[in-house]
């Protein structure tokens, strides 16, 4: 998967189209990423008392994973780009921007 944790991405389709956010977590097996502030859902959490006696529960708003095909990585210029790979002088694979050829 070409999108990694910490990347800034732009949502290109879906209900949050046009939103930018930082990837909080990547799920390579499911081809999904968790993006900060994008695809927010309301989750109903049961009441539970913690050790100090305070109860927590109710309706909680949180982010849900979004499919990786619905996001594009934003490069250093602030524009969305596709990702390519090249090998550096040490033989390691480095991600590059397909738009301008710079390292990401």
Swiss-Prot record:
Residues 93-104 have a biased composition (Basic residues). GO terms for molecular function: rRNA binding; structural constituent of ribosome. Transmembrane segments: none annotated. GO terms for biological process: translation. Residues 82-92 have a biased composition (Basic and acidic residues). SUPFAM superfamilies: Translation proteins SH3-like domain. One of its GO terms (cellular component) is ribosome. Keywords: Ribonucleoprotein, Ribosomal protein, RNA-binding, rRNA-binding. SMART domains: KOW. Residues 82-104 are annotated as: Disordered. Belongs to the universal ribosomal protein uL24 family. One of two assembly initiator proteins, it binds directly to the 5'-end of the 23S rRNA, where it nucleates assembly of the 50S subunit. Part of the 50S ribosomal subunit. NCBIfam families: rplX_bact. This is Large ribosomal subunit protein uL24. The gene is rplX.
